[in-house]
């Protein structure tokens, strides 16, 4: 079962008919979001989905920013941590994957990668800090990693950080 229709949901399409797993890919995706209604909607959907499918393993995608002191007080990051805690209470069979900056064709226009691509295509001026960096994770790599974890079936009720082995300077991303 796949809940959602965005970049992650599309990548996990092969799980649509899976009767044992919920890929929850329908959450707040804009890391600059501050609207409480969006946060409540996600929590309510997780609650309803989990209650309607109590025997299925819940796969939830959170953010590595929870461990980043420079941003972990932002509403989005606080919300993701709150959802992680909520899942631990309402589900007895879950894995939470904390992701770095996800990239892939299509997806959220608010991600750093998609912002840079659209700005370049539209010939817009972009201010870039030469020492700023981002850890980019391709959605295909996310899918392959999660699929392997699920195939091994050795992890339950845990939080797993998924990120690239290195971060990239923003100028590197733009030039490449």
Model-derived features with residue positions:
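N-terminal Rossmann NAD(P)H-binding glycine-rich loop of SDR-like oxidoreductase domains
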Residues: 1-17
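Catalytic phosphate/metal-binding cores of nucleic-acid and nucleotide-processing enzymes, i.e., regions
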Residues: 13-15, 19, 94, 138
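NAD(P)H-binding glycine-rich loop region in Rossmannoid oxidoreductase-like domains
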Residues: 14-55, 63-71
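Active-site beta-alpha turn of Rossmann-fold NAD(P)-dependent dehydrogenases/reductases
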Residues: 26, 59-63, 98-100, 163
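NAD(P)-dependent short-chain dehydrogenase/reductase
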Residues: 85, 89-134, 139-143, 147
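Mid/C-terminal beta-alpha module of Rossmann-like enzyme folds, strongest
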Residues: 152-176
């Amino acid at each position: 079962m796949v809940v959602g229709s965005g970049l992650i949901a599309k990548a996990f399409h092969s799980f649509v008919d899976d009767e044992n797993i919920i890929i929850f890919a329908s959450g707040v995706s804009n890391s600059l979001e501050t609207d409480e209604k969006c946060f409540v909607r996600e929590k309510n959907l997780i609650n309803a989905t989990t209650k309607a499918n109590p025997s299925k393993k819940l796969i939830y995608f959170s953010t590595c920013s929870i461990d980043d002191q420079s941003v972990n007080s932002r509403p989005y990051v606080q919300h993701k941590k709150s959802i992680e805690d909520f899942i631990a209470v309402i589900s007895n069979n879950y894995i939470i994957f904390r992701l770095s900056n996800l990239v892939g064709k299509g997806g959220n226009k608010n991600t750093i990668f998609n912002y840079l691509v659209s700005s370049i295509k539209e010939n817009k001026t972009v201010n870039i800090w030469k020492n700023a960096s981002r850890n980019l994770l391709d959605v295909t790599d996310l899918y392959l990693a999660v699929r392997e974890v699920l195939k091994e079936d050795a992890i339950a009720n845990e939080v797993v950080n998924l990120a690239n082995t290195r971060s990239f300077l923003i100028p590197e991303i733009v030039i490449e």
